[in-house]
Every structure is written in C-alpha cells, then in structure tokens.
Amino acid sequence: MKIVNSIKDLKAYLAEAKQDNKKIGFVPTMGALHNGHLSLVQHCVKNNDVCVVSVFVNPTQFNDKHDLETYPRTLEADCVLLESAGCDYVFAPSVEEMYPEPDTRTFDLGTVSEVMEGAKRPGHFNGVAQVVSKLFYIVEPDNAYFGEKDFQQIAVIRAMVKQLNIPVTINACPIVREGDGLALSSRNTRLTPEQRQKAPLIARTLKESTTFVPGKSVQEVIDYVVNTINSDPVMEVEYYEIVDGNTLESIKNWSDTDYPVGCITVYCGEVRLIDNIKY
C-alpha cells in the first residue's frame, strides 16, 4: 500500500493502472476510520482492480469552526486499518494541496441539497460537492463507495455527478451498526459512557416505528419517533422527516411514494448523531 500526499504522484500511479485497463474503485473519507468505512473499502476491493481511499478533513463542508477543530484525526491508525483491508493507495493531501486557491464554485442541486441537513447546516453540501468533485477529477474512478448512514449526502453526490457529467458509478452501501444498533460514526468516540449507553435508543425507535406502517399515518409515526427519543433527557431530536428516498421531498401519506425513508438527526448531549430507516 502506498501513502500519497500529492495529486501529481497519485495521478502518475493511477495512469499506469488505467493504461492496463484496470478498474479503479474509490472511497472518499475524512479519516477517523471505523468498521463502517472498512466495509466500504471491502466492497471497493472486491469489485475493482485498484482501491484508492482518500483521508482528508475537508474544511469547506464544516459550518461550525469548533466541529472542524475537534474532528478526530488519526491518520497513522487509519493507514494500519486500510492496509489490512486491502487498500492500494491512501491519498492524504494537505488543505493547500486540495485548495491551492479558494474554491468559489456554488452548486445548485435542488431539493436534495436544500432540505434536512441542507437547511440545518448552510453551505455544508456545497462544500461536500466541491471536495468530492475535485477528488473525482483527481482519481477518475470507475466506482465510488458511500455509506447509507449519510443518506442525503448520497443523493447530493448523485445529483452533482449527473450535473457535471462525471463518468463514475455511485455505489451506496448498507449502514454498519454496533451490536446494540447504534450506527457507526466517527463522532461516537465523543460520547460519554452514559450517552453511549443511551444512543441506541435512536435505532431502536426507528426500527419499532416500521411496525406501525401502514396502520398509522406518516405524521403519527413521526410524532412517535420524536416523542419517544425526546423522552430521554440526554437526547434531543433536531429533525425527523419521512421523505421520498429519491427526491428527498417530505411525504404526507404513505401512498405518496413507493420508497419512503425516515431521516433523523439527534443531539445526544453535544454530539450530533444521524441515522435513517427504510419503511
């Protein structure tokens, strides 16, 4: 496995692979890797000849400076995990390498980038589109892999790829969970022991809520999820929306879509956790 810091070097390595008609798979990450990321890497290794993983904490997608500063950075440990998972190239550029000058591009990706996370974190998805488009131009992968925990992010990236005509297949991989149901996230390490004990309530409540469909209305299911989670004093639901899984538009009735997905964000103490479930 090679660890590469410069765009020029990575492009040189990958040019050889492309000349040999090798299929290139790519997993973009911000590091602080866990088994969720590693499952993406395993999908990538299995279905491609070359596996590239980027580790880059992208400043343009953080709308909270404190969040950027406290985001865990564990490159050495990440590389050990990536090597054992069969990764070929780790691309770990500096901010200066990725942004030699400010990226002033703004993306208009419609509803998928405006609702839920888009409304709560202004500029977040624009930053995601900036960095992922740059990474796609650098790596030129055949396949890219993203985790369904960030359900909305996948919709944003699909819209961006379509708009920019980037020839890459976006692969969405299932959420990986702890034994008690909590969706794996780099932010979980910031939970106190008490918060960590309480956090599985999110996944448990979402799962329970699927048993009410179609008997209860969409609004009744939303109320149940929000009230159940908020009944724990450590937890506060920021939003819970049931949307069409393709357009991300909120639905009022189950008949509005054949692909209803519930997307939730919960503050567990200071830590912001996200999850989703298909109905």
Curated annotation (Swiss-Prot):
The active site is at 37 (proton donor). Transmembrane segments: none annotated. ATP binds at residues 30-37, 147-150, 176, 184-187. It is an enzyme of class 6 (ligase). It comes from the Bacteria. It catalyses: (R)-pantoate + beta-alanine + ATP = (R)-pantothenate + AMP + diphosphate + H(+). SUPFAM superfamilies: Nucleotidylyl transferase. The keyword ATP-binding applies. Beta-alanine binds at residue 61. GO terms for biological process: pantothenate biosynthetic process. Keywords: ATP-binding, Cytoplasm, Ligase, Nucleotide-binding, Pantothenate biosynthesis. (R)-pantoate binds at residues 61, 153. Pathway: Cofactor biosynthesis; (R)-pantothenate biosynthesis; (R)-pantothenate from (R)-pantoate and beta-alanine: step 1/1. Its main location: cytoplasm. It is found in: Cytoplasm. The keyword Zinc does not apply. Its EC number is 6.3.2.1. One of its GO terms (molecular function) is pantoate-beta-alanine ligase activity. One of its GO terms (cellular component) is cytosol. InterPro entries: Pantoate_ligase, Pantoate_ligase_C, Rossmann-like_a/b/a_fold. The reaction proceeds by a bi uni uni bi ping pong mechanism. Catalyzes the condensation of pantoate with beta-alanine in an ATP-dependent reaction via a pantoyl-adenylate intermediate. Homodimer. Belongs to the pantothenate synthetase family. This is Pantothenate synthetase. It comes from Parabacteroides distasonis (strain ATCC 8503 / DSM 20701 / CIP 104284 / JCM 5825 / NCTC 11152).
